């Protein structure tokens, strides 16, 4: 801790904010678009850390809010998709994050791919 907070990069600031939240030993960790504003390297580093953190049996339950399915960390078990302020679909992640559901929610033909432990989508 030999640097002032204001001199940290966005990725470093996000890690500090998450670390501060964890100091209170919460039962639930709510992450609202934690990768917003990060470059590709910062995003991937943070997602890797989330995946490692979530695999710890002592870690609190986590809710991650994102607009980009490629930002869903590996190890995520459930998903909920909102549309027009309500729940469009929820359940086990592989049943929720599908081409059919994403196309319906965005009212645009979408292709969802699952590669390794990550999801990717594109408009058709």
Identify the residue ranges that each predicted region occupies.
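Conserved ABC ATPase signature
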Residues: 4-8
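Conserved catalytic motifs of ABC-family nucleotide-binding domains
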Residues: 25
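H-loop (His-switch) and adjacent beta-strand-loop-beta switch element
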Residues: 77-92
């Amino acid at each position: 801790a030999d640097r002032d907070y204001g001199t940290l990069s966005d990725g470093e600031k996000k890690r500090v904010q998450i670390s501060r939240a964890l100091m209170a030993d919460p039962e639930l960790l709510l992450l609202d678009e934690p990768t917003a504003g990060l470059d590709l390297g910062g995003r991937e580093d943070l997602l890797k850390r989330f995946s490692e953190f979530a695999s710890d049996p002592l870690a609190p339950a986590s809710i991650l809010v994102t607009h980009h399915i490629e930002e869903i960390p590996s190890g995520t078990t459930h998903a909920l998709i909102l549309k027009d302020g309500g729940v469009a679909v929820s359940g086990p992640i592989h049943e929720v994050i599908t081409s059919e559901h994403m196309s319906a929610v965005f009212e645009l033909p979408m292709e969802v791919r699952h590669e390794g432990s990550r999801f990717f989508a594109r408009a058709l």
